[in-house]
């Protein structure tokens, strides 16, 4: 039987390229919220969003990996499952990923399927696309994990048709524009109806160059 979960939505202000600062944001949040069953951070929090060409540099990727391993080590002392957005290299391909940590190990990973390539977004040039839905289980709860554009993409809804889960998490770096909050709410409601489960939506705040992130988690 599924148990109740306490969930922390970590709405933070990461900085593109400042990996040490972003790492410390994550570590501080974990340390101050030890009673949470699940801590959810925003899309690509370790690199900042949008990372653009920085993420193609091996030195940058190595720094992200170092910061990630520091967080992994710290998670040994936490009872929380921790969802972290980061660039992720696998089979010589670079992905936009959401990683679930628990007790010093990678418990689950999701590779973003739908890559936006319009307006301020340029992900297809930088990342490879994943190709599978992503579910994991905590305390008897089956949880679906999505990254930003996936809930805007019609293919996502055809792929999850008939799937069952207890909760959906979507991690985001979604910029502000007029009427954007209502659009997000409408999408979250559609996703909730399709999969018959509540939706947890986490976004970041702050500004990167000309892009403003309004949070609204």
Spans of features found by a protein language model:
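Enzyme catalytic cores with a strong preference for nitrogen-chemistry domains
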Residues: 1-217
